Amino acid sequence: MSRSRAWPSFVAALVVLALGALVAVGVGQALGLSYEPADTPPAAVSAVDLDPLVPAPAIATIDVPAGEQVALAASAVSDALTTRGLPAPTVGVGTGDADLTVSLVPPFTDSAEAYRVRTAGRLVLEASETAGAAAGLYALADRIRSGAALPADGAAVEPRLGLRLVDSGSVGREADPAAFATGTDYSLNTDVVAGAVLPEAPWVDQDVVDEIDAQFRQLVQHALRHGYNGVVVPGFLEYVTFSGVGDGHEVYPEGDPHVARAEAMVEAFGPVFAYAQDMGMHVYLLTDMLAVSPPLEAYLERTVGGLDVDDPALWSVYQAGLSELFESMPFVDGLMVRVGEGGAVYQAGWDFSSRLAVTSQSSVQAMLNALLETASAHDREIIFRTWTVGVGAVGDLHTNPKSYEAVLGGIDDPHLIVSTKYTMGDFYSHLPLNPTLETGSHRRIVEFQARREFEGFGALPNDLVADEAQALQQFLAANPHVEGVWNWTQDGGPLRAGPMTLYLRTGFWQMYDLNTYGTARLAWDPDLEPSQVTGDWVRQTLSSDPATSTEITEALARSREAITRGLYIQPFAEQTVKALGLEPPPMMWIFEWDIVTGDSAALDSIYEVSRDGLDVAIADGAGAAEVSAGMREQVASTSPDTWHSPELYRSFVDALDYETDLLGTLAAYRETVLRHAEWLDTGSATAHDQWRAAEQDYRAARAAHVERYSGDLDLPAYLFTAADLGSDRADRDPAMAWAARGLLLAVVVVLVLGFTSARLPGAAALRALVVAATRPWRLGDVPAPTTRADRVLVWALPAVVLVLSRCVYTWFAAPAHLVATLGAWLVLAGVLRWVVRGRDPFHLWAALGGVVLLRTVILLVALVVRGPGRYWFGFWTDPAARTAYITVAFAAFCWLFVVVALVLRRAYGLGTTRSLGATLVAGGTALAVVAGGVAVIGLERALTIWNDQMALLPWGLSRILGITVHLGIPPSSAGVLAVVGIVVAAVGVALALAGRRAPDLTVAATRL
C-alpha cells in the first residue's frame, strides 16, 4: 500500500527535477559568460624628439583676396605672430606687394582646399579656390604658433581626408555649479538651443540666442584654426512645420504652436548656424530617428496606423519635413541620423522626443532610401551613424561586417556617408579597431572622442594622437572610401556628471583640446609623427619654452600608460566577453563613467577572466599610479614662469595630483575586490589576509579622495557608493558562512530528532516535519498531536529557519528580498489556511514547514562554504555548480506545490481535483500579490531597490538608463505576471468548485 501511494510522488519528483534542469539550462544560456582574446592593437608608441623651434617669419603686411572667409583666416596669422611676440601685421585687399601675398591661381590639384607656399623672396600662398586660400592661411598660422618650419617651397599641400567635422562643443550649455555639484545627473541630452525656447510667443529669447551665437562663432573660429571644415549641430523637428504634408495643416493644425515656434526657430537660429557656412564650413544637423512630437505621432497613428517604420507612407512625412528644412535653411549640407539611442527633451514649451523604432534591416533600408531620395533631389547628404548598440535585429551593425553588408550593402548612393566609431564598441581603450571601417563601398567617416567620457571626462591627461594615427593609417590602407573624421570635442556621456569643463569656455578644457587638435592634424596628414603633433600643440597652448615643452610632451607620452593600466583591469579588458546576452565593455569595474562598481556579477566575472593573470592585474593598478606620479614630478619640475600662464601650470599639476590620487585609490580597490574573489574561489588564507589588508588601504584612500575632491567642480571625486555596498557585503561573508554552518547544523539536528523516537517536548511536530520533508505522501498517516507545544513548534520552527536563512542569504542587508520572499510564503499559507478552515491545520503547517526545511538545507549547503559571496561567485562563474544548484533548488520550489496537493488530498480528503484547484488558488494568489505589489511600485524602482540591497548587478544600471532597459526586460512584466497569477488562481477556483460538485474519480472508484 505504501509503495502504491509513493510512486506518484516519485514520478512527480522526477518531473520537477526535469523542470529544474530545463530552467538551469535556460539560465546558463541567458548568463552565458564566455570570453576569448580580443584583437586589441598594440600600444601606439611615439618617441619624443621635437623639432627645434624656428623663428617666426617677419610678416608686417598681408595681401588677401576679398571675402570674410579669407579675412578671418588672415586674422589667425596675425594672432599667431603677436603670440610669438611680433607686431600685428596690416591686412589689406589688393594692396600689391606684401610680406605675405595670397593669390588665387588655376587649379593644380583636385582638392578645393589645396594650397602651396612659395618662400623665395616674399611669401606667396597660392590656391585655386577661397577654401584653399583660407586653409593655407590657417596652416601658416598653426606653423607660426608652434614654432615649426613652413611648408616646403612650392610643394602642393592638400588634406588626406576632405571632410573634417566637429560637434557643437559646449555651445548652448550652461556652467551651472549647482547642477554639476551633485555629480549624479546622468542625462544624455545634447541639445544646443533648448535654453532659448520660450513657452509662448515670441517663442525664443533673443538674448539667449545672442549668447548662443557668440559661443557658436567662437567654436567655428577655433575649429577652423585647428583645421576642421565642418560642424554637426543637433536639431531637426524643431525647425519643421510639415507644411508640405497635405494642405499644410495635417500634421500641425492651424493655430498649433509648433508651427509658429518652428518658424521663429528658423528665423532666430538660421543666421547663427549660417555663419559656419559663410566662414567655409559644412553644416550638418543631427537627429535621432524616429523623431516625433505628440501631434506628429498622432498624425502617423491616424494615417499610417502607428509607427510602422517599414511603410513608405510614414517616411513620406519625414521626406516632406526634410525637404522643408533644406529649403528654409539652405546652408545645411545634410542630415546626420542615429537610430540606436533615443530619448526626450522635456521642458516648458518643448515636447520633441525619439523612439527606438528603426531596429530592423528593412526599416533601416526604408528610412535611408526615403531620406536619400529627398537629399538627392536637393543635392544634399545623409550621414548615417551605425551606432546601433544592440538594438533590435541590426544591433551589431556597428561592429559586424556581415551585418553591415546585409543592411547597407544594397544601398548605392553618392549622397550617403556612413559614420562609425573607430573602436569595436564605445570609446574605450583596449578594444579592437572597428572592422566595419575596413569594408563596404560607401563613403565613410571615422568618429573620435576628444573628451573621453569613460576616462575621466577630459580631466585626466590623455594623449590620443598616437592611437588615432594608428587607427587612421590602418583604415586608410584597407578602405579607399574613408574620406573624413568626426571629432567630439565635448559630446559623449552625461552632461553634468563629470567635471564642469565646457569646451573653450569653462574649466581646464585645454586638457582635451589636445585630442581635438591632433585629430584635425592627422586628418590632413595621417603620417605625421604623433609626438611632434603633441609637441606643436604644447608649444602653442601651454609653453613655447624648449625645455618645458619637451618635459610636458614627454609626460603626455606616458599618459596612455597611466590610463590604460589604471582605469582598466588589463587581463579582462583585452578579452571579448559575453555575459547576460550582452557584450560588457572593457571597463566593467567602473560602470559607467565615474561609478566604481561593487556588484558581484561584474567583479566575479572580471576575476574569472583575469584569474591566470591576477598578480599582473593587481600590480598594474599600483604601476599606473606610479606612472602618474612620475608625470606629475616631471611637469611640476618646470618653472611656472615658462608657461603661457601660471594658471595653466597650476591646472596641469592639479590634474596630475588628482590622477595620482584617483589611480592610487582605484589600485587599492582593485586589489581588494580581486583578492576577495580569489578567497571566494579558493578559500586561501593568504588571499583572505591580502584582501583584508588591501581593504584597509582602500578605505583610507577612498576617504582621503572623497574628502579632498568632493564638491570640486573641476576635479570631482569618483562615486564609491556602489563599491561601498559591495565591500560591506563582502565583509560579512565570513560571518555569514559561520551563521549558515550553525543554522544548517541546527536543522540537521532537528531532522535527526524527527527520525528518532525520542520523547521530547515537540517531538510529534518534529516527526511530522521530517515526514513532510522526506515522505510527504505519508503525512496523512501522522496523528495530530495533543500538546500545544507541538502545534506551535510545527509552524514556528520552520518560520524561524526561513527568516534566519534568508537573512543569512542576504547578508542581513536586503529587507526588500525578505519582504518579497516572506510575503509570498505568508500569502500562500494564508490562502491554504482558509482552504482548510474549520479543520485542524497541523498537517498543513507540517507540509509547508517540511518543504521550508528541505529548501533551507539546499540553500544552506551552498552558503556554508564562504557565505553568500561564494554562492553568487559560483552562480556567475561556475556553470556546472550553477546548473546543479538551480536544478535542485527549482525542483524543491516546484515540490512545494506537489506536497501541498498531497496533504490537501491525503490529510484533508479534498480529492484530486479540489486539491489541485486549491493549490493553484494559493500559488496564483501569492504570485498575483507579489507581482502586483511590484507593479504598483514600478518594476524599475522595485528592481533598483532590490539590487541596491543585494549588490548583484551594476548599481549604475538604474542610474543611467535603467535595469529594465539595459537587460531588455519589458516594464510591463510585473503586471503581466500579476495577471498570470490571477488567471491561475481563477482556474484553481474553477477546479475546486468542479471538485465539490462532482465526486472525485479516485474516490468513486474506491467505493465501487
Cite the ranges covered by each PLM segment.
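Hydrophobic alpha-helical transmembrane segments and adjacent short intramembrane/lumenal linkers
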Residues: A829-W946, P954-G975, A992
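N-terminal Sec-pathway targeting helices
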Residues: S2-V16
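C-terminal non-catalytic alpha-helical accessory regions
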Residues: A38, F180-S187, G484, T489-D728
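Selective detector of the "anchor" transmembrane alpha-helix that sits immediately C-terminal
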Residues: M736-A758, V979-A986
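Feature activates predominantly on carbohydrate-active enzymes
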Residues: S46, A73-A76, A80, T109-S111, ...
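Catalytic-core regions of glycoside hydrolase
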Residues: T82, G169, N229, V259, ...
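Selected alpha-helical membrane-embedding segments in polytopic membrane proteins
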Residues: G762-H843, L848-V852
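Acidic, contiguous N-terminal accessory segments
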Residues: G20-L123, S128-A131, A148-A155
